[in-house]
């Protein structure tokens, strides 16, 4: 019997109906590789192997061993490449689509890594509902939603109750999808000069991420007050105020009230 490790944030999805809903929610993948983070008890992995070849990253050696034993006992139409490695260091050379029941404690970092990675063309993941709602929020409600909208389209698909897991978590989870959009990527990559598109895209994402951290550092305070505290952006405050005037927005706006962060950042960098 496998015991979930609290240190790795393990809650294994065991409800067949929700496992099937996740598999059914996958978009057409050809020609993308399918990459999974976390093999868990192997329930989702085995269902995926009925439809796709799969590469799975798993840091827990005991779960890797259990998965190998399961594959010996039941043959699947497609092959599994099981990589015993921390998914935070995931690096693929070919375009891929990501799927995962994400560990709660590093879910945000893993999603941001995928959004920043030009090779990742989209993702279908489950995370704590509160986290999923932040990524899928509309307009400029928070830094995560702005980052997501800058590179693709996010959709909240369905909630998963604690009873669907072993052991059950204390909170609801949600499955959501992000599909990268080439036109949005092109706009993000145009922020900075780089010899290759993928490098420019990654630098553009990182620059926007850094800027948003400053803008949303204290969400209830005005944008101006937040940027005054930023070592990187306090000297650009006058240009921010100029931009707000051009957009007919008051100087007292909060970060969540900015209409177009990409346009603002482009103005600061090139204006």
UniProtKB/Swiss-Prot annotation:
SUPFAM superfamilies recorded: S-adenosyl-L-methionine-dependent methyltransferases (SSF53335)
Keyword entries, A-Z: Cytoplasm, Methyltransferase, RNA-binding, rRNA processing, S-adenosyl-L-methionine, Transferase
List of residues binding S-adenosyl-L-methionine: 11, 13, 38, 58, 86, 101
Reaction catalysed by this enzyme: adenosine(1518)/adenosine(1519) in 16S rRNA + 4 S-adenosyl-L-methionine = N(6)-dimethyladenosine(1518)/N(6)-dimethyladenosine(1519) in 16S rRNA + 4 S-adenosyl-L-homocysteine + 4 H(+)
MF-aspect GO terms: 16S rRNA (adenine(1518)-N(6)/adenine(1519)-N(6))-dimethyltransferase activity; RNA binding
SMART domains, alphabetized: rADc
EC number, as in UniProt: 2.1.1.182
Location of this chain's protein in the cell: Cytoplasm
Domain of life: Bacteria
Pfam families: RrnaAD
Record-linked InterPro entries: KsgA/Erm (IPR001737), rRNA_Ade_diMease-like_C (IPR023165), rRNA_Ade_Mease_Trfase_CS (IPR020596), rRNA_Ade_methylase_Trfase_N (IPR020598), rRNA_adenine_dimethylase (IPR011530), SAM-dependent_MTases_sf (IPR029063)
GO cellular-component term (any): cytosol
Chief place of localization: cytoplasm
Reported function: Specifically dimethylates two adjacent adenosines (A1518 and A1519) in the loop of a conserved hairpin near the 3'-end of 16S rRNA in the 30S particle. May play a critical role in biogenesis of 30S subunits.
Family: Belongs to the class I-like SAM-binding methyltransferase superfamily. rRNA adenine N(6)-methyltransferase family. RsmA subfamily.
Protein name stated in the entry: Ribosomal RNA small subunit methyltransferase A
